């Protein structure tokens, strides 16, 4: 009985120690992923501040003519959904293909750096060009579909970055496809309504 109790306590302590070690590793990975995104975002802010105002004005979403036309045009939702599907699926496919190579961590890090850089540059450029209205325009431009895109991408990113500890399964496949599909539908059918409603107030 004495030895049995000793073995149970030893096993319990060992399991807690292993669990604690896993928690530390998870937290470290989370911090690393967040750091890559934040670094890219900071570089994007700096880059946007170095651009000239004329150059910023020529960027598609900040061009006055583009904004006027977008606010008045009648969008064919099915065609727009098909267009979005083609341009949104490509990055997912590339990330998935490159993620299955031995450079998966480098791929994930580069993806987060580029995503953070793009967000930082666009949001800063919008403020420089249009003030607070530009920032609101950017936020509305990412609503509500971006939440689902982020959720779908995070499943892929977390899997590739923590492999082989994290394993892929049917649940992850279904969740990723579902999140991305919902994001596409919302971007095609809901976001244009929000964008046009806001542009009419400018």
Positions of PLM-derived features:
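Alpha-helical transmembrane segments of multipass membrane proteins
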Residues: 40-44, 48, 91, 149-152, ...
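Interfacial helix-start motif at the membrane-water boundary
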Residues: 70-96
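Interfacial/capping segments of alpha-helical transmembrane domains
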Residues: 49-69
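Cytoplasmic juxtamembrane regions at transmembrane-helix boundaries
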Residues: 98-120, 170-181
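Hydrophobic alpha-helical transmembrane segments of integral membrane proteins
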Residues: 114-144, 191-192
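N-terminal signal-anchor transmembrane alpha helix
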Residues: 24-56
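Cytosolic juxtamembrane amphipathic/interface segments immediately preceding
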Residues: 14-29, 71, 95
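Terminal transmembrane helical module of multi-pass membrane proteins
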Residues: 153-202
